[in-house]
């Protein structure tokens, strides 16, 4: 049950009589996050870089003759993204947890190119000063880019496309609101979460994703593209 003083404060906020506290809070959150992203989130948690290097090694091993379970790569991805969001939670008060990466896929578009997708799901809780936790959300966001092999030169080169960051592609579903059906409060929470996630995608996740793919040599990328073509050809007609 919401305490009476919180309801009084809430009414003041919605009426615009409390100096637009949620707006100030939102801007302050984004300033702190921007500063953290500029410094590098691994300066707050050195484990991020360790996990990232392990992930690079694991993905490279998928291109070798060794048998490596794809699930191992996904586990490192989950560990990496979870650590990143833990730092974000400390900086912003927007708590992002229970991160899951169902898979990482290479979808061949030609013999030398593919779309690469990393779908991410997580639980989000947004807190505001004085009001505390205001809304729980379900997060779905896809990291998407392209990778190709340029064969015009003597040594084939790996070319990685832009990692898309469209805030509207970030899906946030309301699971529970501490203030019932007060839409303005829910909107504040959803919009703040969207801006935080969008900033993290642009400033941390996409650069990591790009660096991960650029670390692979042309032979490795060619093999990953070939594996995706084989998988597509083996799918039953009705499952496509």
Curated annotation (Swiss-Prot):
It is found in: Secreted. It comes from the Eukaryota. Keywords: Disulfide bond, Secreted, Signal. Disulfide bonds join 163-206. Its main location: secreted. The keyword Signal applies. This is Short palate, lung and nasal epithelium carcinoma-associated protein 2B. It comes from Bos taurus.
């Amino acid at each position: 049950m919401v305490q009476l003083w919180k309801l009084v404060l809430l009414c003041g906020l919605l009426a615009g009589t409390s100096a637009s506290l949620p707006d100030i809070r939102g801007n302050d959150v984004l300033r702190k996050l921007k500063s953290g992203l500029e410094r590098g989130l691994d300066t707050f948690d050195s484990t991020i870089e360790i996990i990232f290097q392990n992930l690079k090694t694991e993905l490279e091993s998928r291109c070798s003759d060794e048998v490596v379970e794809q699930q191992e790569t996904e586990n490192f991805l989950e560990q990496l993204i979870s650590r990143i969001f833990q730092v974000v939670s400390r900086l912003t008060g927007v708590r992002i947890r229970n991160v899951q990466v169902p898979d990482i896929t290479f979808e061949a578009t030609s013999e030398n190119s593919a779309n690469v997708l990393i779908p991410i799901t997580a639980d989000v809780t947004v807190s505001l000063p004085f009001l505390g936790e205001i809304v729980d959300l379900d997060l779905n966001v896809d990291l998407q880019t392209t990778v190709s092999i340029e064969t015009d030169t003597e040594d084939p080169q790996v070319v990685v496309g832009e990692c898309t960051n469209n805030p509207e592609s970030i899906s946030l579903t309301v699971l529970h609101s501490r203030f019932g059906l007060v839409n303005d409060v829910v909107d504040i929470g959803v919009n703040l979460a969207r801006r935080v996630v969008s900033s993290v995608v642009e400033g941390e996740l996409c650069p990591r994703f790009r660096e991960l793919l650029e670390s692979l040599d042309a032979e490795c990328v060619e093999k990953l593209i070939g594996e995706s073509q084989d998988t597509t050809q083996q799918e039953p007609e009705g499952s496509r």
